[in-house]
Amino acid sequence: MTKVAIIGAGPCGLSALRSFEQAEKNGEKIPEIVCFDKQEDWGGLWNYSWRTGSDQYGDPVPNSMYRYLWSNGPKECLEFADYSFDEHFGKPIPSFPPREVLYNYILGRVKKGNLKSKIKFNTTVTNVSYDNENFEVTYRDKKNDKISKDIFDYVIVSTGHFSVPFIPEYPGMKAFPGRIMHSHDFRDAEEFRGKNVVVLGSSYSAEDVALQCHKYGAKSVTIGYRHNPMGFKWPEGMKEVFHLDRLEGNKAIFKDGHVQETDAVILCTGYLHHFPFMSEDLKLKTGNRLYPPMLYKGVVWQNNHKLMYLGMQDQFHTFNMFDCQAWFARDVIMGKIKTPNDSEIEKDINKWVSMEEKLENADQMIDFQTEYTKELHELSDYPKIDFELIRKTFKEWEHHKVENIMTYRNKSFASPVTGSVGPIHHTPWEEAMDDSLKTFLNK
């Protein structure tokens, strides 16, 4: 029997497991599936941990979630086509839920089946190599410190790319008397109440960590950008300045001449695509971009069609895009989709990369990824979902942020699956200090 290894049981890995489960429910004979995950439970990044640094077994903690995290994009844009929010919660819910609510939704879909039995938890994959038409996967049982090997016909890498932080060095860091941390280790904005905070970065992490610090009482928040400012209308106590040059004592000196006394520096400087367990000839090497190179349809490894990577893109679309990728990967593995010859694959990859290189703004990026996801959707039997409505919702969301970065989470949108419109949340985001599922749903 064909054997498939799935590495990671976060959203991408769960999409892969779900895709095979659905095929089996449809009466198809599926391969033997083994999923590996280094954590104690499923959910990937959404499985919040208080830990930073190392876990109890000495491995790096993969989690980057923090307390009081609320979705920074409309939930409707990530809705599963085969499992709506309405079905899970029994009613429409507001469009911007906190982490616990989304985690509950993610698990609700996979708990319906017997998927957990296919996952080896507390298991770290240490090496994947390919020879004689097969993959050899070496893995370590962390609890028992036992090394094992197994042979697979296909490998799906679904580890994500938001767990290994990129940490730059600036002059003066060693002598800085305050707190320096990467957003990967950020857990609680309450730590910075009454303090002056410098946040370095200009993408979603910088935006949200800065807003969290402001919301929970930071004295001031100064955001340092390298290339282009986010440019939002920040509330009093927040500002953007150009590029940190150095730290001198407790002062942050920026290249535009701005000087800011600070108690803490939070590096929101992104993450690395990091696959130390993959042999060199199988390893994806890319920055954070909408169409990584070497991946046919953004999924199949160009040099070995038995290897797939899920969720490696910079992302507007998330969960339903991961599903479309997983359904596509499944159908390649099960022979329902035939990969073309090398020349056609090269041509297809170059087409998407060329289009990506011409993108100039967020609206164009949304269009690009929507068209990519729609194309994948049409290639499999993934259930119907309104990607045109998702496109429209993304663009409205972007414009709401430009209008008011503090209130965009108070808007509501329609589901691309059921059409129901989420109610306005009972408490404006800026005033909502309790992020529990119970309070969110029932107050």
Swiss-Prot record:
Pfam families: FMO-like. FAD binds at D37, Q39, L45, W46, N72, V125, Q315, T318. Its cofactor is FAD. It comes from the Bacteria. Its EC number is 1.14.13.148. Gene3D superfamilies: FAD/NAD(P)-binding domain. NADP(+) binds at W70, N72, Y170, S202, S203, S205, R226, R409. GO terms for molecular function: flavin adenine dinucleotide binding; N,N-dimethylaniline monooxygenase activity; NADP binding. It catalyses: trimethylamine + NADPH + O2 = trimethylamine N-oxide + NADP(+) + H2O. It is an enzyme of class 1 (oxidoreductase). Keywords: FAD, Flavoprotein, Monooxygenase, NADP, Oxidoreductase. Belongs to the FMO family. PANTHER family: DIMETHYLANILINE MONOOXYGENASE. Catalyzes the oxidation of trimethylamine (TMA) to produce trimethylamine N-oxide (TMAO). In vitro, has a broad substrate specificity, oxidizing many nitrogen- and sulfur-containing compounds, including dimethylamine (DMA), dimethylsulfide (DMS) and dimethylsulfoxide (DMSO). This is Trimethylamine monooxygenase. It comes from Pelagibacter ubique (strain HTCC1002). The lineage of its organism: Bacteria, Pseudomonadati, Pseudomonadota, Alphaproteobacteria, Candidatus Pelagibacterales. The gene is tmm.
